A protein has these predicted regions:
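Short, glycine-/small- and polar/acidic-enriched structural segments
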Residues: 31-187, 206-207, 214
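N-terminal secretory signal peptides
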Residues: 1-7, 11, 15-25
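Short linear loop/turn motifs
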Residues: 70, 78-79, 210-211, 274-281, ...
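Secondary-structure end/capping motifs
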Residues: 228-314
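Conserved C-terminal helix/tail region of periplasmic/extracytoplasmic solute-binding proteins
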Residues: 301-339
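Short, surface-exposed acidic
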Residues: 162-167, 265-278, 317-325
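Basic/polar N-terminal segments that are highly enriched at the extreme N-terminus
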Residues: 1-6, 31-33, 339
Length: 339
């Protein structure tokens, strides 16, 4: 499917597409209030997996925090990190790997919040074919994309004994999967399984995060300069984003956000959006782990340390990397959005 997000799709953005969303009528913003204008770059086309940001715009949450937020939709031709480096955007959507890349490459950027506690990446196969666990996949061909080979694949190799000889090219469609009952392919829990179901298959899904893969996803990344010079603005943006995600995942007045998603990305429809939200809730993609007690966006030093060390041990990052420069806990873990 092409309706997904991720740095895994060669890094992102539709060329020059910038879509400013208008808050719903009735948002309680004094007419004389001066709003701080910010831009937020997503890493793929609009979809439910970006819903909390759209909710924060559509429901006037950013405006209540004194922010006018322009969501710039991603796509296959541009790279959010490069846009951040060039100073063309204020915040970007990213992941834990990119944050460690900043440190390795000496770039002055960092992660200030992690919306998804679980990376939505899955391997999926067909029900009833005898493949009932990751262990059962050892030695079998698996359709894997280029980015997956340098992110979750080393983890799977180390944990389950997978080998590079198992890799087959993944072309970002479910056609080969549908044609082979023994097929195993990568996907996102909220995307490819739905496409397979719509085509009449019965996919069985294995969430890599549930096997111990600790990558944070849908992170909020920003420049160190903005953190230093506009700390209050960063905090307000993070708080408003968390409130948007809390409302969106609970289904609270989400019609405006969903309409904006469908307007920005006509490939989206109500069924795809509903499925994505349902499975994200069921799997605890956003609300699980530390987020249950500290609020959506939660991050911890212990998890960052464990993630870095795991990726170091499989050769993804060098020993001695100052991984603590990749993130700041200053803006999260405040129980924002919790009842």
């Amino acid at each position: 499917m092409r309706t997904r997000y991720r740095m895994e799709r060669r890094a992102l953005l539709t060329g020059g597409t910038a879509l400013a969303l208008t808050a719903v009528a009735g948002a309680r913003v004094p007419l004389a209030q001066t709003l701080d204008k910010v831009s937020f770059q997503t890493n793929w086309r609009a979809q439910a997996e970006h819903g909390g940001y759209y909710q924060a715009v559509a429901a006037g949450i950013y405006r209540r925090h004194g922010i006018e937020c322009e969501i710039r939709m991603g796509g296959p031709q541009q790279n959010p990190a490069q846009l951040l480096l060039a100073g063309r955007v204020d915040f970007i959507m990213s992941n834990g790997f990119q944050a460690l890349n900043y440190v390795r490459e000496g770039l002055p950027f960092l992660t200030v919040g992690a919306i998804m506690q679980k990376d939505p990446q899955v391997l999926m196969t067909h029900e009833g074919n005898g493949i009932n666990s990751f262990e059962d996949m050892k030695g079998r061909p698996i359709l894997i994309g280029a980015s997956g080979r340098v992110t979750y694949w080393p983890f799977l190799k180390a944990k389950f004994g997978f080998t590079d000889e198992q890799i087959r090219p993944y072309t970002f469609n479910v056609g080969p999967f549908l044609a082979d009952r023994m097929a195993i392919q990568q996907g996102f829990i909220s995307s490819e399984p739905f496409a397979a179901q719509q085509a009449g298959a019965r996919p069985r899904v294995f969430l890599i995060a549930d096997a111990g893969y600790q990558n944070y996803q849908t992170t909020i990344d920003v420049s160190q300069r903005m953190v230093n010079e506009k700390k209050d603005l960063v905090q307000r943006f993070v708080n408003a984003t968390i409130e948007g995600w809390s409302a969106y995942m609970k289904g609270q007045d989400v019609a405006g956000a969903n309409a904006a998603i469908k307007r920005d990305n006509p490939e989206m429809d109500d069924a795809k959006i509903a499925y994505a939200v349902q499975v994200m809730n069921q799997a605890g993609i956003v609300a699980s782990g530390d987020a249950l007690t500290m609020g959506i966006g939660a991050m911890t030093e212990a998890r960052w340390k464990s993630f870095y060390e795991g990726m170091r041990d499989v050769g993804r990052y060098p020993a001695g990397l100052d991984y603590a420069k990749a993130y700041s806990l200053e803006f999260v873990n405040k129980r924002v959005g919790l009842a």
